[in-house]
């Protein structure tokens, strides 16, 4: 009898179809029981997720019709009530500096855990291109990191990377509610990406969390892109189901919510209230927040942003957002985390490198003086400077939760949070948006979601800001300064700018890399997005189908 030549496949439960490439290492993550756990989460919560996504669309329709975001009168009692969240886990009381980066590649995970930061936020979201290989390798990496066994052999350099005796505490950021996982079908539908990310990570690691995170705590998460407290309520339900299934103490799972959408800034108390048993505070996701400001006000010609380089924390609406977040978190007894420092070391120019570090120091001094308890960094080289600023101000305290810091937020009003930003709009700004947006998207399509560009570590938020700003300027025919001459933003101007900037990118990266990369494809997608009649919600959602690779041989075995 001839030996079977059937391709190996994943052992999936009824109703689950794995379409991603089969790999024996991945099969250790995609076990039957793990997939059954993820499927159970999806089946229980998919109706609530669909409703929440429809409510997002309905809210946007109201904003497009002229309504402005505001505090919800129906939840006044929550905002004014005297309540606090569960006490801070002792193991993560000190979060003065957190380093962020994708969960894959493996060497980057090890370096981040060894970086000297208090926390490493391993990302399945904006800093990762969600290819099948990245997602599955990321789960393998985090399983090994939690176990303390992760290592990497760099054969060409003859170097082995391993964990130090003391490492950063591990947080994990799953994708947002809106993103699917098309390589896994549940009852014929794409899986909800964040439930795959969280579900697989939790299932394989919950028994080991206590050793690394502190007894009775874990996992620790960051939750992105929420717009309303109903979305936090779903996460709370997911956490409760997971804790019950694992037989661990309620409240073991803790999550920091990134306030990175304009609607969410009006829902911060409500979000914390929904997650009060599981909350680890809020974070100023400032780059995506700018993106969301444009998207929310896409139909409002009186709210055009200036060049994105001018939209910093000195703008009134950004400063108000930061102050209100700090006040809200400290009132509820949780961490108020600051925003990302995206600078990366400039190795060949000491003066430029010191100037960049000085910008980081000033930004972080502003944050800690305002009352933030910690902040984010994109590169290990920033950590010593940031720690010096925060630790020098805190004077040995792990955080400012019990202090009066952040009282400025008590007086923030609705109009403060939506005040139009000031500054010039220029053709140079349009050019930079094209140049950075196209290069980021090309890297994302090629499998990299954390991309060094012009001495900054960029993630998807940069491409999103660049895209929606160009779209907004074109949609409303914004007047742009072209070296002292006023020109109107038009599709014809954008086409010329794209052609010229693509040539510049080719000159910068070299013809061979340009030809082999996905730059031309990225240029077409970016141009189409900027000139579309209707603004797409997310660039990464539109481009996702271009990185999905179904392998029929990987489908579950049929006996």
From Swiss-Prot:
Catalytic residues in the record: 173 (proton acceptor), 459 (proton donor)
GO cellular component, one term: cytoplasm
EC class of the enzyme, as a word: transferase
Motif (Microbody targeting signal): 557-559
PROSITE patterns xref list: MALATE_SYNTHASE
Predominant location category: other
Protein name as annotated: Malate synthase, glyoxysomal
Organism whose genome encodes this protein: Zea mays
Phylogenetic lineage: Eukaryota, Viridiplantae, Streptophyta, Embryophyta, Tracheophyta
């Amino acid at each position: 009898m001839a030996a079977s030549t059937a391709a190996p496949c994943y052992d999936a439960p009824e109703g689950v179809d794995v379409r991603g490439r089969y790999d024996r290492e991945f099969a250790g993550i995609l076990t039957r029981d793990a997939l059954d756990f993820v499927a159970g989460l999806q089946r229980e919560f998919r109706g609530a997720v669909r409703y929440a996504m429809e409510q997002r669309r309905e809210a946007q329709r109201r904003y497009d019709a002229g309504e402005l975001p505001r505090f919800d009168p129906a939840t006044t009692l929550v905002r004014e009530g005297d309540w606090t969240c569960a006490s801070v886990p002792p193991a993560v009381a000190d979060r003065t500096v957190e380093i962020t980066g994708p969960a894959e590649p493996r060497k980057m995970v090890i370096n981040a855990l060894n970086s000297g930061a208090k926390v490493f936020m391993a990302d399945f979201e904006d800093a990762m291109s969600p290819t099948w290989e990245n997602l599955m390798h990321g789960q393998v990496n985090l399983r090994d990191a939690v176990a303390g066994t992760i290592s990497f052999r760099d054969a060409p350099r003859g170097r082995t990377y391993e964990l130090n005796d003391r490492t950063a505490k591990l947080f994990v950021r799953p994708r947002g509610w809106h993103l699917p996982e098309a390589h896994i079908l549940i009852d014929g539908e794409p899986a909800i990406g964040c439930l795959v990310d969280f579900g697989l990570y939790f299932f394989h690691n919950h028994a080991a969390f206590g050793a690394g995170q502190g007894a009775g705590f874990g996992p620790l998460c960051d939750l992105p892109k929420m717009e309303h407290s109903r979305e936090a309520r779903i996460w709370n339900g997911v956490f409760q189901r997971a804790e019950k299934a694992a037989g661990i103490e309620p409240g073991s799972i803790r999550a920091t919510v990134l306030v990175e959408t304009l609607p969410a800034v009006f829902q911060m108390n409500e979000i914390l209230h929904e997650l009060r048993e599981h909350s680890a505070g809020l974070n100023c996701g400032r780059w995506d927040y700018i993106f969301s400001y444009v998207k929310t006000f896409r139909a409002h010609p009186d709210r055009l942003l200036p060049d994105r380089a001018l939209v910093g924390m000195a703008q009134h609406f950004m400063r108000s957002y930061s102050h209100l977040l700090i006040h809200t978190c400290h009132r509820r007894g949780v961490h108020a985390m600051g925003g990302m420092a995206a600078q990366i070391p400039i190795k060949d120019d000491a003066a430029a490198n010191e100037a960049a570090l000085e910008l980081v120091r000033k930004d972080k001094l502003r944050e800690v003086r305002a009352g933030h308890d910690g902040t984010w960094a994109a590169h290990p080289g920033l950590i010593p400077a940031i720690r010096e600023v925060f630790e020098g101000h805190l004077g040995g305290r792990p955080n400012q939760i019990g202090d009066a810091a952040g009282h400025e937020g008590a007086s923030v009003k609705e109009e403060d949070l939506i005040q139009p930003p000031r500054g010039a709009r220029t053709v140079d700004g349009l050019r930079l948006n094209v140049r950075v947006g196209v290069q980021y998207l090309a890297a994302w399509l090629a499998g990299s979601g954390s991309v060094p560009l012009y001495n900054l570590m960029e993630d998807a938020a940069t491409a999103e800001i660049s895209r929606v700003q160009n779209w907004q300027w074109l949609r409303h025919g914004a007047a742009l300064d072209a070296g002292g001459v006023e020109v109107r933003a038009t599709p014809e101007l954008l086409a010329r700018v794209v052609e010229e900037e693509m040539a510049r990118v080719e000159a910068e990266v070299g013809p061979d890399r340009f030809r082999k990369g996905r730059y031309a494809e990225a240029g077409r997608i970016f141009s189409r997005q900027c000139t579309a009649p209707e603004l797409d919600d997310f660039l990464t959602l539109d481009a996702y189908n271009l990185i999905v690779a179904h392998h029929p041989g990987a489908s579950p075995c049929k006996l």
